Amino acid sequence: MISIFIAEDQQMLLGALGSLLNLEDDMEVVGKGTTGQDAVDFVKKRQPDVCIMDIEMPGKTGLEAAEELKDTGCKIIILTTFARPGYFQRAIKAGVKGYLLKDSPSEELANAIRSVMNGKRIYAPELMEDLYSEANPLTDREKEVLELVADGKNTKEIAQELSIKSGTVRNYISMILEKLEVKNRIEAITRSKEKGWFK
């Protein structure tokens, strides 16, 4: 019998997932929680075979919990609405065995759990495509400017550091916002982090 812990902050989905998996003859949901910390505490104490987690939960996220549980022997499966390459890359680094999207068919989750228990890794196909197809649209100089923005530097400081005029820096920032399809500098930094484009 495969023992499973589920961490999901949407109560209705948490209940539905638990009910669905308990219908499987070879699976038993032994615990449920609504935060990443719930998952960390339960897994360390009870050591279930599998832990299924959402990413965005109050307090500790699913990715932070996965990083903390990397060496416990529990197989982590991320189940999320976020098909973001940056999240996916971080999950892979954390040793996550499965990464599925919430719009996947329900039987796919049960099959993924069995596959993971057999030593396989199961990742949503569309994420694998995105991982290899989504290139950073920024030029090297634009990347340099954005990294300085992320370091908290203002237009004047960036101009001094790169030995260019403030107006040129503003032009670069306008191009960055346009290429990343965002409204401001904060969104540009967030988008680049999500895509895993920062060094």
UniProtKB/Swiss-Prot annotation:
Function: Member of the two-component regulatory system DesR/DesK, responsible for cold induction of the des gene coding for the Delta5 acyl-lipid desaturase.
One GO biological process term: regulation of DNA-templated transcription
Post-translational events: Phosphorylated by DesK.
Highest taxon of the lineage: Bacteria
InterPro entries per record: CheY-like_superfamily, Sig_transdc_resp-reg_C-effctor, Sig_transdc_resp-reg_receiver, Tscrpt_reg_LuxR_C, WalR-like, WH-like_DNA-bd_sf
UniProt keyword Transcription, yes or no: yes
Pfam family, one: GerE
Subcellular location: Cytoplasm
Residues that bear 4-aspartylphosphate: D54
Protein name (Swiss-Prot/TrEMBL): Transcriptional regulatory protein DesR
Annotated region of DNA binding: 155-174
Major localization listed first in the record, in broad terms: cytoplasm
Domain Response regulatory stretches: 3-117
Keywords for this protein: Cytoplasm, DNA-binding, Phosphoprotein, Transcription, Transcription regulation, Two-component regulatory system
Boundaries of every HTH luxR-type domain copy: 131-196
GO annotations of cellular component type: cytoplasm
A single MF term (Gene Ontology): DNA binding
